[in-house]
């Protein structure tokens, strides 16, 4: 498969030390050579070499560059690739790009370089999606999961499962088409059930990693809730180690939602500091309270902050009711002051949810809180080693559908259905697993997936 030659700026826009303009396609080297001036021609350059020179437009030098030449097929796209390393400005880099476009290159679509790597067989679809996961990773663990997926861990596992299914389907087909041959091993219902159970167990094992994998990939939407002036903004500032939220003794200081990402011992949290939830006549504060209620409803995880120096109120108890059904940790703040809170009642309301005491003004209790968060979501252990996580929502949905199809095979066999009937569900499971790696996928889906990428990737 041969495409046209594309070009795009691969580095973020703005000022910086270096900017990279990337070309890929059959004319990549020739197009770059038309605007590059140096001692030797790029067209004569060996693969994987770097060359110093200048970019000229109408005889005028517009950039001093280093150009990397990489010849097919030993490139990311398996096409000829040229990368022009220029100074990280806005004007000069765009002039170089426009010059390339005028000399025959087409502007790349978002994700088109990675899409070509997939279409040319360099990577499969799950590996392509892992590229974006790596770019978006918020923690070292999320980065590790993405790198292992890019390396093909998930792909190999899925392909092995598809091969198991294919072997069984082939045996069934032989039995159906050539029943008269004595030397053909009969695929009995028991044998098919054993094959199915083997694949089904592996799919279930993958799905058991889904909740942790999704957390690592997307982070937890974490609402910090509580009545006004209990220490919510102080908690946000402590967790992100920055004075992001205004902290005063005046109740109702936080009027709007503040969001920040933070890595808590490998657990990525999208912290949402909400306005204190209370009845108020202040129009602006009332809007903030309504937004807080929505953030609470949409949260994956809640930090419910109470003031240990005040008695428990009806509003506090209402927060426990609102948090019901969510994972949450109760934070008893201001332990440096006299305890007036009914701790036994708090334990009763919290049930099995962890309770942590803090004095944020004295930097006390934060380590215990971080440990409680890690333990709540990863049972205290997030070191997965070389374990294969499934974290992509699309992959998870396809695995659930494949599991449903495999369950259909098992049910059909148990009901005594003929093998050639239950193979329909077996074939469906094979197709669904193939959608994960891109072995069976629609063009419309490919366009949708790669359009999520940035330009130049």
Swiss-Prot record:
InterPro entries: G_TrmE, GTP-bd, GTP-bd_TrmE_N, GTPase_MnmE, MnmE_dom2, MnmE_helical, P-loop_NTPase, Small_GTP-bd. GO terms for cellular component: cytoplasm; cytosol. GTP binds at residues 229-234, 248-254, 273-276. K(+) binds at residues 229, 248, 250, 253. Transmembrane segments: none annotated. Binds 1 potassium ion per subunit. Gene3D superfamilies: P-loop containing nucleotide triphosphate hydrolases, Probable tRNA modification gtpase trme, domain 1, tRNA modification GTPase MnmE domain 2. Mg(2+) binds at residues 233, 254. It comes from the Bacteria. Its EC number is 3.6.-.-. (6S)-5-formyl-5,6,7,8-tetrahydrofolate binds at residues 22, 83, 122, 457. Its cofactor is K(+). It is an enzyme of class 3 (hydrolase). Homodimer. Heterotetramer of two MnmE and two MnmG subunits. Belongs to the TRAFAC class TrmE-Era-EngA-EngB-Septin-like GTPase superfamily. TrmE GTPase family. This is tRNA modification GTPase MnmE.
């Amino acid at each position: 498969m041969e495409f046209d030659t594309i070009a795009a700026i691969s580095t973020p826009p703005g000022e910086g030390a270096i900017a990279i303009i990337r070309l890929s396609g059959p004319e990549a080297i020739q197009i770059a050579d038309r605007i590059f001036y140096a001692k030797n021609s790029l067209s004569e350059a060996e693969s994987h070499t770097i060359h110093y020179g200048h970019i000229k437009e109408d005889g005028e030098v517009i950039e001093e560059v280093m150009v990397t030449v990489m010849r097919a097929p030993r490139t990311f796209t398996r096409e000829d690739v040229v990368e022009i390393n220029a100074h990280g400005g806005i004007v000069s880099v765009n002039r170089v790009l426009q010059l390339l476009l005028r000399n025959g290159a087409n502007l790349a679509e978002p994700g088109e370089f990675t899409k070509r790597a997939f279409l040319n067989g360099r990577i499969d679809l799950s590996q392509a999606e892992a590229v974006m996961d790596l770019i978006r990773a918020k923690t070292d663990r999320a980065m590790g999961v993405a790198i292992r997926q890019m390396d093909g861990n998930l792909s190999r596992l899925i392909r092995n499962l598809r091969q198991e299914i294919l072997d069984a389907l082939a045996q069934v087909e032989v039995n159906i088409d050539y029943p008269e041959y004595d030397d053909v091993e009969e695929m009995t219902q028991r044998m098919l059930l054993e094959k199915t159970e083997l694949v089904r167990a592996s799919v279930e094992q993958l799905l058991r990693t889904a909740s942790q994998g999704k957390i690592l990939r997307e982070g937890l939407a974490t609402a910090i809730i509580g009545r006004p002036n209990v220490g919510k903004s102080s908690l946000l500032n402590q967790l992100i180690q920055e004075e992001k939220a205004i902290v005063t003794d005046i109740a109702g200081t936080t009027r709007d939602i503040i969001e920040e990402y933070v890595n808590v011992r490998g657990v990525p949290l999208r912290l949402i500091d909400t306005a204190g939830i209370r009845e108020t006549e202040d129009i602006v504060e009332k809007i903030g309270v309504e937004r807080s209620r929505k953030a609470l409803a949409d949260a994956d995880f809640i930090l419910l902050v109470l003031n240990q120096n005040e008695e428990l109120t009806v509003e506090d108890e209402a927060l426990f009711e609102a948090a019901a059904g969510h994972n949450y940790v109760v934070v008893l703040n201001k332990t440096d002051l006299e305890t007036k809170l009914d701790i036994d009642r708090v334990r009763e309301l919290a049930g099995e949810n962890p309770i942590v005491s803090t004095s944020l003004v004295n930097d006390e209790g934060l380590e215990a809180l971080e440990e409680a968060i890690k333990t709540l979501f990863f049972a205290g252990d997030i070191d997965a080693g070389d374990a294969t996580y499934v974290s992509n929502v699309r992959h998870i949905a396809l695995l659930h559908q494949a599991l449903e199809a495999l369950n259909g095979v098992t049910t059909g066999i148990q009901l005594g259905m003929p093998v050639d009937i239950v193979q329909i569900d077996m074939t469906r499971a094979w197709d669904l697993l193939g959608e994960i790696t891109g072995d069976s996928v629609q063009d419309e889906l490919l366009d949708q997936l790669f359009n999520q990428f940035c330009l130049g990737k």
